[in-house]
């Protein structure tokens, strides 16, 4: 449920567009492989519209989750309330025949204005926010995001923090999380990316509706 063509494309070692958005990779064999895979996957549902409720009832074998969603619903009591009828855990995204177990990752960027009169102070502040382990550890305490520091992501204190309210044996594997971050794909966000993606998405939806 909720597995998209874009996720399949990334996991097959390719992106829909080049870095500047001046050309697409639609004619690449890896792109067509990805679309065919998603189409065959959807055909197994035999026109049944799978919903999030099917997952909640334990009728779905696999569903992509964001890290923030995982953190929201794994701890007690939310997990017991929403997913009490079955056990579930996290694994890496499936790999395409020409790719790897990769998934899209959103990154929060920090920047400094070229017009600032306090360049050194601004640069020191950015470095402090991004390299200080105590500050980076607060990300796990106060948000549903992940740190940019491997030392924080793989630390025992972080693992204990994430798993303290998780019932049973369903713990978050920090080495898995670190690997997912290392192999994550940050999309090329060129100027007209949203428009290009929406047009592509509509075309692909039409392609998937055409019978063989």
Residue spans of the language-model regions?
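Extracytoplasmic/secreted proteins, especially bacterial periplasmic and envelope-associated proteins
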Residues: 4, 30-37, 50, 59, ...
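Extracytoplasmic/periplasmic substrate-recognition and gating elements
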Residues: 43, 78-150, 183-185
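Extracytoplasmic/periplasmic solute-binding protein
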Residues: 1-24, 60-62
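C-terminal capping/gating helix-and-loop segments adjacent to ligand/active sites or protein-protein/ligand interfaces
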Residues: 165-212
